[in-house]
Amino acid sequence: LLKKIYSDPQSKIFPPYKHQDFIWNKKKYLTKFKNSGIPINPTIFVKGSVTIPRLLAQISSYKWEQFIVKPIGGCEGHGCGFFTTRDIIQEPTKLMDYFIEHAKYYEEFLVQRLTIGFKKYGEVKSFWIDGSYRYAIVTKDVPPDGEYIYPSIIKPMTDKKILGVCKPIGEKVLQKIPKLVFNGKKTDPVMTRIDLVCCLDNQPKSSMAYYVNEIEEGGLAGSYTNIEGITYPIVDILADAYVRKAVELLK
């Protein structure tokens, strides 16, 4: 229903549906980034009706010891499945059951090597406003035992060496995100969040082999500025940015 409303040409939404559809669809943007030479985690895209033996043969040929399956269109980790290749080869029904269950809700899925560094080093979430880097945080999962306020440890990203690797990747990503078209004019998005993880192919941290894990539309991504230590004045900056964008598009 929401997709139908957003895609209706009579709907006056911002960012326009075409842009949001690109951001929401990992297959679209990961494919574009790969073809543009932007580092991503090698990815297999499959339908819910996937042939399991064929998929396992492909995973085995890549020598992935562990892998993750994510539904395209899922969010906040919903529907993610984590598997060990050796176990699934011995008992493929576990993977079959996963697709039987989740194909009720999703048409397509992506399959990737499990990156050990995601939990070990966390994920760098970088925020870009008006095409410029503004700030970044790092989130690290907390084991689900005991009570805690937030599901992750969240801190400002201040490591200059890591930022020196991530920011150039982010700049390349912004260049490949399609322009918005609104009121007959082309323009850039107001805010984009670019999330990066280390390390590609489970290389050691010293490799600094960060890659793009996902991107988010800035207005919906969450700024994390309600977390202690994250002090960027996001409300004031975004308010000014959206007013400038409105003036630009409505002139």
Predicted segments with their positions:
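Generic domain-boundary/flexible-linker signal
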Residues: 54, 137, 223-226
